[in-house]
């Protein structure tokens, strides 16, 4: 299971052959806007214009790529299967079933909030797996920190974009963006997998 619904404003539409890449700007209840990278076939986008409000249905996907620094990076995006009319409010709802593929990172923020970073491997049928970053707060952070590698979980939340500061040894500070599922609900399920990752 890997399903996401996004409703918001489409922008930065780029067509390359039969592939279309674009960004969905989705407003939270707080007013903050998440900018989510999306990809679809040109036949799905039809005549969608920059600035148009739409609803997208698809899956959270990830792919590794080599950056300018020659290091491997993880791209998180939404593979859009269906585009429908906008229904009057922004939406960002995701449900993913998968396995914890590396040990959870439980810690406290500088403001003393509990936080837990996880990577969930979600099987894509015969096409391999997507390795999806997730972040949990407070009580969810404490509970998810107790998961073991290979344990099956169902996660509900939103796909968010979050800016953070990357500090290098030479003192340079770079603003970067993380894309991850912010967990609002989770449960364990009977699946488990040995040697995940």
Regions picked out by a protein language model, each given a short descriptive name:
Residues 1-197:
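Single-stranded nucleic acid-binding surfaces, predominantly the OB-fold ssDNA-binding core
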